[in-house]
Amino acid sequence: MVVTTATKPHPFSIENILKSASPKPQKPLFSYNALIAMAISQSPLKKLTLSEIYDFIIETFPYYRDNKKGWQNSIRHNLSLNKCFVKVPRHYNDPGKGNYWMLNPNSDEVFIGGKLRRRPGQNGGSLESYMHLKTRTSPYQRGDTVCKRDRVVYLSNSGAGNCQFYQPVPCSSPTAMLSRSSLIVQTSPTTLTIPHHPPQNYIQTLSPNVSPVRVGNQTSPRQSALPSSSLPLLPSPPSLPSKLSSPPLPSLSTNLPSPPLDTGDILLSPFLRQTVDSTSQNFLEHMIRIREQVQRSGHLALAQSRAVVYQPIPRKSL
């Protein structure tokens, strides 16, 4: 029995010399997605299985024939992760194994120059879409954009029926808008607040431009010169008498002097003077009587506490 052993070819054999002389195939510049799209688009049915895609790549590009490490896994990953490839189940009458892969007709990517590129003119690539985005930018950018602002209403001298509106004005920067808003705050009327205890000897004014005046001296506030930018104030309400008359009170049993009560100390603001009627006057008179009675009763109690009652001390018998 003769045993033959396989011998390795000599490194300087003819086969090795021919292999070294022939140029090695270069790796193609196409991406894996482009290779898959090329294989599917050149098939007659426009669909291929995974093994058929492998066969097309090996037959078309000899580089992948000799280097089978890694690229087949990359083909599988690109088929499952890329949205431009769609898996189509095999029909039950179709013999064979594996599903088919097709190109997605709704995909935004096309095969251009060996790479899958997005179609021009879609997804904001055109000039019209760019101009549309420019028009939707913030109103604070530089340009002739109009800042929309709510209208501000001021009351005029003729009453609430005639109102003065502030129209929107164009502004080109945030600083201009801030300056305009500050102007509105300066010229807007002051909010009227009614305190629980009015300040003594001076009336409550509607605006800092009106100087305070005693009620007993003048019946209406004296208005100072207004600047040209300020708005006219409301007409002054009708004046009221400086002092309220109260009926005489019954005398008490004590002869202690009571402090004088001057009803002129209770001052009214212009808003209150305009809204006071007969009912409120009666209420004020009633409150004045109560305060005077409380003051007199306090003086009586103070005098009784200070009074010394004389009681004779009995003498002890010696």
UniProtKB/Swiss-Prot annotation:
GO cellular component, one term: nucleus
Compartment(s) where it occurs, according to its Swiss-Prot or TrEMBL record: Nucleus
Keyword line: Developmental protein, DNA-binding, Nucleus, Transcription, Transcription regulation
Tree of life domain: Eukaryota
Record has Nucleus as a keyword: yes
One Pfam family per UniProt: Forkhead
Expression (tissue specificity): Expressed in uncleaved zygotes with increasing intensity until the 8-cell stage. Confined to aboral region during 16-cell and 32-cell stage, afterwards found in ectodermal derivatives, in particular surrounding the blastopore and along the tentacular axis. Not expressed in the apical organ nor along the esophageal axis in mesodermal and endodermal derivatives. Expression subsides after hatching.
GO molecular function: DNA-binding transcription factor activity; sequence-specific double-stranded DNA binding
Skewed-composition ranges (Polar residues): 201-210
Record's compositionally biased regions (Low complexity): 220-233, 241-256
Protein's UniProt keywords contain Transferase: no
Record GO biological process: regulation of transcription by RNA polymerase II
Region (Disordered): 193-258
Family matches, as Gene3D superfamilies: Winged helix-like DNA-binding domain superfamily/Winged helix DNA-binding domain
DNA-binding region extent: 27-121
InterPro entries: Fork_head_dom (IPR001766), FOXG1 (IPR047208), TF_fork_head_CS_2 (IPR030456), WH-like_DNA-bd_sf (IPR036388), WH_DNA-bd_sf (IPR036390)
Functional description taken from the UniProt entry: Probable transcription factor.
Listed name of the protein: Forkhead box protein G1
Gene behind this protein: FOXG1
